[in-house]
């Protein structure tokens, strides 16, 4: 249970810290990466949801 709580805290912490970068602008040469950069903070949450679905599939063994 502690590991799951730690994982949640890490995901929330990384999402909060990376949200401060939303106000920064990429250099013009990298402007085509903007859509990818906008999605990147969500990736840890997707991994957490994948782990949750996986554990539900094996009945939380």
Curated annotation (Swiss-Prot):
Transmembrane helix as UniProt keyword: yes
One of the GO biological process terms: photosynthesis
Entry membrane topology: Single-pass membrane protein
GO cellular component: chloroplast thylakoid membrane; photosystem II reaction center
Chain ranges passing through the membrane: 40-60
Locations listed in the record: Plastid, Chloroplast thylakoid membrane
Main location: plastid
Alphabetical keyword list: Chloroplast, Membrane, Photosynthesis, Photosystem II, Plastid, Reaction center, Thylakoid, Transmembrane, Transmembrane helix
Keyword Cell membrane: no
SUPFAM superfamilies linked: Photosystem II reaction center protein K, PsbK (SSF161037)
Domain of life of the native organism: Eukaryota
Propeptide: 1-24
Residues of the signal peptide: none
The family this protein is said to belong to: Belongs to the PsbK family.
Task of the protein: One of the components of the core complex of photosystem II (PSII). PSII is a light-driven water:plastoquinone oxidoreductase that uses light energy to abstract electrons from H(2)O, generating O(2) and a proton gradient subsequently used for ATP formation. It consists of a core antenna complex that captures photons, and an electron transfer chain that converts photonic excitation into a charge separation.
Subunit text: PSII is composed of 1 copy each of membrane proteins PsbA, PsbB, PsbC, PsbD, PsbE, PsbF, PsbH, PsbI, PsbJ, PsbK, PsbL, PsbM, PsbT, PsbX, PsbY, PsbZ, Psb30/Ycf12, at least 3 peripheral proteins of the oxygen-evolving complex and a large number of cofactors. It forms dimeric complexes.
The name this protein goes by in its record: Photosystem II reaction center protein K
Organism: Liriodendron tulipifera
């Amino acid at each position: 249970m502690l590991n799951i709580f730690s994982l949640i805290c890490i995901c929330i912490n990384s999402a909060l810290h990376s949200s401060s970068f939303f106000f920064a602008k990429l250099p013009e040469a990298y402007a085509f990466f903007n859509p990818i950069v906008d999605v990147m903070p969500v990736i840890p949450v997707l991994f957490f949801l994948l782990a949750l679905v996986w554990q539900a599939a094996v009945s939380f063994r």
